[in-house]
Amino acid sequence: MLGDEKEGTSAIPGFNQIQFEGFYRFIDQGLIEELAKFPKIEDIDHEIEFQLFVETYQLVEPLIKERDAVYESLTYSSELYVSAGLIWKTSRNMQEQRIFIGNIPLMNSLGTSIVNGIYRIVINQILQSPGIYYQSELDHNGISVYTGTIISDWGGRLELEIDKKARIWARVSRKQKISILVLSSAMGLNLREILENVCYPEIFLSFLTDKEKKKIGSKENAILEFYQQFSCVGGDPIFSESLCKELQKKFFHQRCELGRIGRRNINWRLNLNIPQNNIFLLPRDVLAAADHLIGMKFGMGTLDDMNHLKNKRIRSVADLLQDQLGLALARLENVVKGTISGAIRHKLIPTPQNLVTSTPLTTTYESFFGLHPLSQVLDRTNPLTQIVHGRKLSYLGPGGLTGRTANFRIRDIHPSHYGRICPIDTSEGINVGLIGSLSIHARIGDWGSLESPFYELFEKSKKARIRMLFLSPSQDEYYMIAAGNSLALNRGIQEEQAVPARYRQEFLTIAWEEVHLRSIFPFQYFSIGASLIPFIEHNDANRALMSSNMQRQAVPLSRSEKCIVGTGLERQVALDSGVPAIAEHEGKILYTDTEKIVFSGNGDTLSIPLIMYQRSNKNTCMHQKPQVRRGKCIKKGQILADGAATVGGELALGKNILVAYMPWEGYNFEDAVLISECLVYGDIYTSFHIRKYEIQTHVTTQGPERITKEIPHLEGRLLRNLDKNGIVMLGSWVETGDILVGKLTPQVAKESSYAPEDRLLRAILGIQVSTSKETCLKLPIGGRGRVIDVRWVQKKGGSSYNPEIIRVYISQKREIKVGDKVAGRHGNKGIISKILPRQDMPYLQDGRPVDMVFNPLGVPSRMNVGQIFECSLGLAGSLLDRHYRIAPFDERYEQEASRKLVFSELYEASKQTANPWVFEPEYPGKSRIFDGRTGDPFEQPVIIGKPYILKLIHQVDDKIHGRSSGHYALVTQQPLRGRSKQGGQRVGEMEVWALEGFGVAHILQEMLTYKSDHIRARQEVLGTTIIGGTIPKPEDAPESFRLLVRELRSLALELNHFLVSEKNFQINRKEV
């Protein structure tokens, strides 16, 4: 963060900065800390000693480029080398060598890592900070029970509780508790030392019975009592060294290691001055905690709010990577110990290089990036998605909460989130409130706390000076903080008025002179997604949440367009996403085409490769378009090429289109949207999608699989696009069912399946006739398109464990269709219900037909009025050829500021274009429009405008599905479930109720028998349908009913069913 003391201005920090700082901290500090902890390893006879020399570690630059790592499914990593020494104590000789410890995945310029060719990102986790927390709960009698919970660095808990007789207990498990005296004695104190170190010795003496005195008579007795209660062991255990080690390992290491953050928190909470390097829980801590608990019981001290951010810490990328390095080095230690003992047993002379293997470190990091819940595949739908993904904060993950167990209080917005965690941007569904997003200016402090910047206001010799402070959640409670959305521009007016301020989590109204701090920026409280919503202050928070989530689902369009109405953050989001190509220094363009830009600068000639039709992991198209011409001089930081969803270096997710808010023949009922065919034929909402299909070749027991064009028993038209090697040719147009890669898998045929001539060859010449099964890669349903890339990846040492992989990339051009999802930036989403001819669409007074018709009933009940402001201002901007960048909370300048701005711009547009219908004083913002089918004006004036509308990734091509025949489940004999398995219609309990409610007995019987799981009946249906006969009624029960009977029989319950004749009520028993 850049701060200027004189002017009080600040620059927005880089949006990827959190990730970069975390990784830098790991490389700069965490790596050395973990290597320094690696112990000296000796053999059993103490003759050989192995140690690492941390000061000389070295990370080597990667041998491959990022792009190659993605295409060849490799990891973009750096090799770690450390000097190691092997000392022979008898001769005092030392052999020192530089050894390779393993590969550490590196972070690229996007703040992500490439592991096995996949972009992965590590997100930050919020955990309960280690320390002590005091709380009170009501017991079943309605009496307050006070507890103090000590949380260790590993998340282990030790609870101290005080009962109604003022006796203090330490709870070691859910059911078992021991006296605080026994715990203190087991930690090494005697009774005299305990009483000397507490504030209330008389309370401790009050529950000291003869039985307790015996338990704490010696340290051994106390440890035995503690062990008995902790391990729930009966009888009389005997004190031993192994018992102490077990207690140390299972209890003290897990629940008493505080770490440096825990030590700092306990010192602050209990007013102790124990050195910071003492990271374990001491007897003095326990006694001070007990004293504090007694004070709580008698009304002294304050309880802790567990959901306050001062009681949370951020586990960043640095902490997670450091933990994994510690785990890998612990594994390496075991390997070295085993290798030394093996070398001595076989009388071999070891060297440092022979002792160390790179496997533990490399495999630990690969499994961390591949399996850890906080390591996620980077969502690359559009530039905004990439940026926002790295700024997520999660309560989930190891040591955290789960979606099932988290209560409402944890999910709720807390006053301490102000300026640190966005109150709007969170996920919808079960994880609501558990996955948040960092506010724009928030940063992670040295102690794992979230810090937010404020301007400090103070006067010195009557000259106001401003200084910027970064405050942690525990610090800003002591200041009066003026809210940034209530500051007028005119300081003279400011000093006279009372302003709303925040103090100790309460909102007050105070005089301006009493303000200590003020916010630095109107967007300070919001995440990036919420900050891109114009007029957000006029929207309901739920709709703003939906909007910030839906902007991340917007598909990059083939021809992007900047928004007319924005917030001003669009440029920074685009630049920090890394999507546009930017000049690193000034120079002159020498050559440019679609693949590269060559320019000279600083005496060098640089070639910048451009991304061409690259697939993102959401199948969207990443493509860069040059924006500079040959011979042009450029400056540092200038845009050389625009990427997907950027225009001129600004984020451009959607299109400004002409919209009317009116009902139209019921086609926009329940959020449906009506569109004009202009949007289809003009390629307004056309997007490109790239799908990847891959096939592997293995070495089977019968021999290797072959890639070939010669595939028997297949029609020639299916193989028409294959080249001589059996792989589809570049540029081919492929349809569903076409062969992309021809492959044959060898298999052994049975004797009876051989043709007579084959048997003759075997009998006379002994020739083994091989048969092969066709296992080609075929294009699935909905995959038609143009082949744009083919990659044949051959791993080194092509063994059966390293199969060859062939990847085929197919590009699809998708126009907007009925069933696609579109949305605005205010949570106003809808599905396209009908595409009208342009001549039938409602048209304006100047003859222009409207592009899209929204339902006006979607606005009042949802309270997202911001869309109306944006709509009208967009119309004015398109007529005046202006773009607007509006900060939120503009009402801080004057009342009704948004409405005044919109009306004044509409009035100006009306004057300049000489179109009085743009601003009509009787109904400003609305206009009389005409029905395209009849030419008659509609009864009511209608709001028209140009909002920014996005096309979302939820497209009908990915979702529509039908099946005539397909696979059935073996057990229930019902159609499989889901589009991916070519599944069919499954009729459940609620569907049956719905059909029963309408009384459609015959349809219901069909659904439950022929169309579902009646095996014989569904076989007969086809034949009777072909010959035009009547479908016979099924005589016995369907398979699911028979399955139910079998399950009941397994529970020893016999169920019979009978058929009752309609004529004579004769009962015929049928066997299931």
From Swiss-Prot:
Q: What class of enzyme is it?
A: transferase
* PROSITE patterns in alphabetical order: RNA_POL_BETA
Q: Which chemical reaction does it catalyze?
A: RNA(n) + a ribonucleoside 5'-triphosphate = RNA(n+1) + diphosphate
Q: Which UniProt keywords apply?
A: Chloroplast, DNA-directed RNA polymerase, Nucleotidyltransferase, Plastid, Transcription, Transferase
Q: Name one GO cellular component term.
A: chloroplast nucleoid
Q: Does the keyword Nucleotidyltransferase apply?
A: yes
Q: Which domain of life is it from?
A: Eukaryota
Subcellular location(s) per record: Plastid, Chloroplast
Q: Which is one GO molecular function term here?
A: DNA binding
Q: Name one Pfam family in it.
A: RNA_pol_Rpb2_7
Question: GO biological process annotations for this chain's record?
Answer: DNA-templated transcription elongation
Q: What is its EC number?
A: 2.7.7.6
Write down the InterPro entries for this protein, in alphabetical order.
DNA-dir_RNA_pol_bsu_ext_1_sf (IPR042107), DNA-dir_RNA_pol_su2 (IPR015712), DNA-dir_RNAP_su2_dom (IPR007120), DNA-dir_RNAP_su2_hyb_sf (IPR037033), RNA_pol_bsu_bac (IPR010243), RNA_pol_bsu_CS (IPR007121), RNA_pol_Rpb2_2 (IPR007642), RNA_pol_Rpb2_2_sf (IPR037034)
- Name the PANTHER family for this protein: DNA-DIRECTED RNA POLYMERASE I SUBUNIT 2
Its subunit composition reads: In plastids the minimal PEP RNA polymerase catalytic core is composed of four subunits: alpha, beta, beta', and beta''. When a (nuclear-encoded) sigma factor is associated with the core the holoenzyme is formed, which can initiate transcription.
| Known function | DNA-dependent RNA polymerase catalyzes the transcription of DNA into RNA using the four ribonucleoside triphosphates as substrates.
NCBIfam families per the UniProt record, alphabetical: PRK00405.1
Name the family: Belongs to the RNA polymerase beta chain family.
Name the chain's protein. Answer: DNA-directed RNA polymerase subunit beta
UniProt gene name: rpoB
